[in-house]
Design a protein with these regions (language model features):
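Membrane transport/envelope proteins' first extracytoplasmic loop
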Residues: 2-268, 283, 302-303, 462-464, ...
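Short cytosolic juxtamembrane segments of multi-pass membrane proteins
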Residues: 3, 382-400, 782-796
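Interfacial "coupling" helices/loops that link adjacent transmembrane helices in transporter permeases
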Residues: 16, 275-317, 680-722
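Short, strongly hydrophobic transmembrane alpha-helices
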Residues: 18-43, 314, 429-454
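Juxtamembrane segments of multi-pass membrane proteins
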Residues: 60-62, 413-541, 548-552, 564, ...
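Small-residue-rich transmembrane alpha-helices
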Residues: 274, 278-281, 314-346, 355-381, ...
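Alpha-helical transmembrane segments of integral membrane proteins
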Residues: 381-435
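C-terminal transmembrane helical bundles of large multi-pass transporters
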Residues: 601, 609-615, 627-630, 634-740, ...
Length: 796
């Protein structure tokens, strides 16, 4: 049989079920958030990186044309190389059942035994792929609307079309940039099918593994430069080195930064629940002050009573764990599943590790326990005389502080409203904790809405610089007089030609940078692009040897300024350009802009272009789609090989995918904080009503009706909500700015985002907090209206 002290603990939990439910739910939300983020992060880092390393990713790759087996064998014998393989891929388009054309990149399997890196796992159908069949990477199946055994119409860049059979599926986390983000699907074909499609017999890329220090990126760069040098000595032109972060999935930095941000917010949710524990335990001690006196009078020591209430807090925490741990597992699965759709990996298990469980248990038991120590120790120090001689409700009187004296001067409100106003400030410690809870919830919500506005504004500013409706990239340079016919497409008001190159920066000792820099050769007086300048000026038509650099270049060379010279190696040619302007943006379209006529002459491409920019008369998606289709059809009729066709609307929508994902989860965390804030307010109002039982009875005795009492309680809740909104609105500005800086790291931006403080978010939170305060105050107000004079006489 339980000892009396433990029966008292159970009685306290059971006698006030609303109080118990509020505290348990509040703690559970914080523990759930911890479990969701910690568990989801564990799944992501374990399974995403595990699947990535399982395909045996290369240390680096070097692109070049006409690679043969002899060159591959030469590279395999180089010092520092553990293994190497050559790959061949072709980019084309595939038609979906709806008639849309989507990008498809096919890797040619020439020798299955020689496939050493980025090795796919067969799922269905024959492997390697048979003649006239295509084996799709699994993420391509829903993207293309394909199924095993179905026909897939593909179109090459020269306009030739072929029908292939979907022979099966494979899984390869290393096939390429995720389909959901890149809008490019991946597949595999045999050597015979490649020959049918006209794919050249050689290879166009070399992947290799270093033999030592495989996680040392600097070491990999040294070996990669040696491999590139070997390729160039063979007479081939390097298409650039690609080095990914060793040992982890390419998007690991994004995942780490994003989950860290979610983790910080989940900690706030737990912190807010701790405030409710402080309020609840403080109120419980105040209500049971006579019980404490009786226990002390019959021999209970301070430590016995402290132990009693600590066990009560532990019971709150234990009950919250029963709710939060299963929900945390579901939340972790949901968070990881969202990333599965983006990054294409397998979830091995959702069972939380001992580390995650330990974090949740510590959050559910230790944090509330620590939060309750102060009210428990201070509340149990009361003497027997003080406990039995007081009423337990005498504290919290109004009229002693400066704030109280200021409120006494308010006379223009009705008496019930004055009572609500003064009641709000009776328990200032409790009010402070409740305001802290709601204020934190509000400022996080307003900060998230501001981040959405900042990100959308940043993306909008980027696209406002682009006065182009249709982008057409060609597979090789073409003379512009062959391309001029696209101007005849109905709806086209202007046509501009660009060329794109990739170059390496040259140091004073003539060593090349490991990173390549995109160079856009544009008409200086064109209208398709309006770059915002931070320093210097934009290009002039008469400029020769001039360049405008962007954040993509200055991030690596921050000391570069207007008037400096930059040396580049482009397609084997060494060039020296003078910086005439600098444009800083978080997501620059290129590292350098140069003048098309003069630069193309330097490169031997005078009168040629690799890109076409079309400007339409009506800037809507329907017009853009029609013009893109007609222009592409016209070019193919002229024998022009089109690599990619994009419209502005589609490009902008794709750019918002990652932003919308981040904002969605930040809003989810903000909602959790708001829920904790609402529970905290409901708990505070319930405690206030309980402590004012006698006052409510007096009001009943002098004729106060149910509606009047309910209005007093709800008005008090609304006032607390309004004060928290005002405090949150003031603090939200600096928090929004700091969060803006944090998101720059999440998205690995080259420069600062445009910061926007959203007044819409402030207005939205005002509406939400008023509704939240009304709902949170309704049940306590309803309970208050049910108090009778008989209840008051029986109240202890």
């Amino acid at each position: 049989m339980l000892a009396p002290r433990w029966r008292k603990v159970l009685g306290d939990l059971w006698s006030n079920k609303l109080r118990t439910a509020l505290v348990v739910l509040s703690i559970a939300i914080g523990v759930f958030a911890i479990g969701m983020v910690a568990g989801g992060r564990e799944i992501l880092l374990r399974d995403l990186n595990g699947d990535w390393n399982a395909v045996n990713p290369a240390s680096a790759s070097v692109a070049a044309d006409n690679i043969d087996d002899e060159l591959v064998q030469t590279i395999r014998r180089m010092p520092g190389i553990a293994d190497a393989q050559a790959t061949s891929s072709v980019s084309l388009r595939a038609q979906t059942p709806a008639g849309d054309w989507k990008d498809l990149q096919l890797t040619v399997i020439r020798d299955l035994e020689d496939l050493r890196m980025y090795v796919p796992t067969p799922l269905t159908g024959p492997w390697p792929p048979e003649r006239r069949t295509v084996t799709l990477e699994r993420s391509a199946v829903p993207f293309l609307g394909a199924s095993e055994g179905s026909q897939l119409l593909v179109e090459l860049r020269d306009g030739e079309q072929y029908t292939l059979i979907v022979g099966g599926t494979v899984y390869n986390n290393g096939a390429g940039f995720p389909t959901a983000l890149s809008q490019i699907s991946y597949g595999y074909i045999s050597d015979e099918t490649a020959e049918l499609l006209g794919v050249p017999p050689g290879f166009n890329s070399i992947d290799f593994l270093v033999s030592e220090n495989r996680l040392d990126e600097d070491h990999i760069r040294v070996i990669a430069n040696q491999v590139e040098g070997k390729i160039e000595k063979s007479g081939r032109i390097s298409g650039g080195i690609n080095i990914l972060k060793p040992g982890v999935y390419p998007a690991d930095d994004f995942v780490q930064a994003f989950t860290l941000l979610l983790g910080i917010i989940s900690f706030f949710a737990l912190l807010l629940s701790a405030f409710l524990v402080v309020n609840t335990i403080g109120a419980l001690l105040n209500q049971q002050i006579r019980q404490i006196g009786v226990m002390k009078s019959i021999g209970a020591r301070n430590r016995d009573i402290v132990q009693l209430y600590l066990v009560t807090v532990l019971a709150f925490g234990a009950l919250s764990l029963l709710v939060a741990i299963p929900l945390g597992v579901l939340g972790a699965w949901g968070l990881a599943s969202f990333f599965v759709a983006l990054f294409n990996f397998n979830i091995a298990t959702v069972v939380p590790s001992p580390s995650v469980l330990a974090q949740q248990i510590a959050a559910g038991l230790l944090i509330p326990l620590l939060a309750a120590l102060v009210p428990i120790f201070s509340g149990t120090r009361v003497t027997v005389r003080e406990a039995l001689g007081g009423h337990g409700l005498g504290k919290g009187r109004f009229g002693r502080s400066r704030i109280d004296r200021m409120l006494e001067r308010v006379h223009f409100l009705s008496r019930p409203m004055l009572l609500s106003l003064r009641n709000t400030f009776r328990r200032k410690g409790r009010l402070a904790l409740t305001l802290t809870t709601l204020t934190l919830a509000g400022l996080i919500f307003m900060a998230v809405i501001s981040q959405r506005a900042s990100l959308k504004t940043t993306i909008s500013e980027i696209f406002n610089q682009i006065n182009t409706d249709v982008f057409i990239n060609l597979s090789k340079p073409y003379r512009t007089n062959v391309l001029d016919q696209v101007a005849a497409v109905p709806g086209v008001t202007d046509v501009e030609y660009w060329s794109s190159y990739s170059g390496r920066a040259l140091a004073a000792d003539d060593s090349e940078s490991s990173a390549g820099y995109g160079i856009s050769s544009v008409p200086a007086d064109g209208d398709s692009l309006h770059v915002l300048m931070d320093e210097g000026r934009w290009l002039l038509p008469e400029d020769e040897g001039a360049a405008v650099i962007t954040s993509a270049y200055t991030t690596d060379y921050p000391d570069t300024k207007v008037g400096d010279s930059v040396r580049l190696k482009v397609n084997g040619k060494e060039l020296e350009l003078m910086v005439v302007g600098i444009s800083r943006a978080p997501f620059p379209l290129a590292a350098l802009y140069v003048n098309l006529p003069t630069f193309s002459r330097q490169m031997g491409d005078a009168g040629r272009a690799t890109e076409i920019k079309l400007i339409t008369d009506v800037r809507d998606s329907a017009t853009q789609d029609r013009v893109a289709a007609q222009a592409e059809q016209l070019l193919k009729a002229q024998g022009v090989e089109v690599a990619v066709t994009r419209t502005l609307t589609v490009t902008e929508a794709q750019s918002n995918i990652g932003i919308d994902m981040v904002i969605l989860f930040l809003l989810l965390m903000a909602v959790l904080l708001a829920a904790v804030g609402g529970l905290g307010l409901m708990g505070t109002m319930s405690i206030n009503v309980l402590e004012r039982t006698r006052e409510i009875g007096v009001m009943r005795a002098i004729g106060a009706g149910n509606g009047a009492i309910q209005r007093i309680v709800i008005a008090e809740g609304l006032l607390i909500g309004l004060i928290s909104w005002a405090l949150g609105a003031v603090l939200a500005f600096p928090v929004s700015y700091l969060m803006n800086k944090g998101l720059e790291g999440v998205f690995q931006a080259e420069d600062s985002f445009t910061f926007v403080f959203s007044l819409l978010g402030v207005a939205m939170w005002l509406a939400i907090v008023l509704v939240l305060a009304t709902v949170a105050s309704f049940l306590p107000a309803w309970n208050a209206s049910r108090v009778t004079v008989r209840d008051v006489l029986a109240y202890e």
